[in-house]
Amino acid sequence: MRTIAEVLRWRARRHPSLQAVWFEGKSQSFAELNESSSQIAAALVDKLGLEPGDRVAIIDKNSAAYLELFFALDKAGLVAAPINWRLTPHEAKLIVDDVKPKLIVTGSEFKAHGVAAGGPTLTFADLPRGGDDPMRDVDGAVTWQFCTSGTTGLPKGAMLTGWNVLNTGLCLAMQMPEIREGGRALCCMPLFHIGGGGWVIWAMQAGSTAVIVREIVPDVLLKTIVEQRIETALLVPAMMLFLTELPASRTADFSAFKHIAYGTAPISPALLRRSIETFKCRFSQLYGLTETTGPFAALGHEHHVGERLLSCGRPMFGGRARVVDSGDRELPPREVGEVVYRGENLMAGYWEREQETADAIRGGWFHTGDAGYMDEEGFIFLKDRIKDVIVTGGENVYPAEVEAVLMGHPEVLECAVIGVPDSRWGETVKAVVVPRAGTGLSEASLIEWSRDKLAGFKRPRSVDFVEALPRNASGKLLKRTLREPYWAGYARRVN
């Protein structure tokens, strides 16, 4: 099997009555999901006239319909381009302008985002249906285009093939054999992320039921875990914190849990210990990026001891990682450089960004932008971020984008945006601002000013005012110097 559509067809033949997905009290078998997604795929081709390779943007919270559309688009030979529903209409339009979709599909509450973006828009309820599986999925074709970005803050589409997705799923199944046929996997990460969209496919690839949660509400999440007898889950540390802090967690029945994977944000040893005590199951840390189709390295439960707790693990089956210097020369163990990776889950490239693809993938090795080292046994230890991306609660925030907004304030002379440690979110956004002379700019007024210009997770949670920003002799801003006081005492400064 080389496409996600093939996975669904095969599962529908092998176990047609096995529950494929559960969402808000309703379920579909693999056979039912296969049939319904085929009807949408046929209509997209026959009634809407979409051609192989056309992009279809999706804006909504998690749902069974979202998953159904993933399969339908692949069957029709189309590319799914999920967009973060938390973005403002203005921000969503920037992504749509880059993706150039032939169709935008939204939930009913986000139709205005699609309309504002200027593209042809249908809600899930309005999608046409009817016809047989067009079977236009092709090995090697792009299946998903997830939005990612560099330190410029400009959107880039990471193009992932069906085999990229399935290869990660096979590697993950070896790391977590508890993801099994007939099992129940919690799917609570946003489907517009590789961690959400990927996890739901990887669970179904193994034959598990995807138990989808629309959005993260701690009480609802806890109730779902207990009532649905969840066996496996992918969580971010913020979710683990929410769950372990709920009073009901002290008496909840978590006995069905077999294995929890966590990642996408820094985690404290104290929270990890508390989570292990609460859920009483195996834990694996995952490390990867959108460009690597999610995780390429894992720290298994048996390695959650001693110094290894600071590691993000070793490359999973079939992948290779190394640490290189600025000249791409491999470094010896324990010498810090840039972590690079190669494997079959490496993206096809950035959408319409040939030069940026060439810059990121050199000699077959993807440059992660993360600084770290490897020990003598191949465990990766991350130290800092070469790229300036801030990871807050599993969401990527690009400082240049936030800085551009804040610089639009008439009382801001200069600003720099950095990530600072936070026990709940891993990191939060901090703005360091040089105000114009004679103004009365305050922290509260600047944050409020950004409210309708930035999504909530991008807005600064705090603002420091300074007389000048630190720069070197050539005038380059020294963000490391800005970050240092806030990160003092932290051994690890990156997800």
Which residues make up each language-model segment?
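AMP-dependent adenylate-forming
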Residues: 6-29, 58
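AMP-binding/adenylate-forming catalytic core of the ANL superfamily
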Residues: 87, 104, 225, 233, ...
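Conserved AMP-binding A3 loop
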Residues: 29-31, 143-170
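Gly/Ser/Thr-rich phosphate-binding loop
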Residues: 205, 230-235, 245-307, 320, ...
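ANL superfamily AMP-binding
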Residues: 17-18, 32-57, 87-88, 93, ...
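Conserved AMP-binding/adenylate-forming
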Residues: 26, 43-90, 396
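Conserved AMP-binding/adenylation subdomain of ANL enzymes
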Residues: 166-184, 192-232, 245-246
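Conserved pre-ATP/AMP-binding loop-to-beta segment of ANL
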Residues: 16-17, 130-147, 154, 164, ...
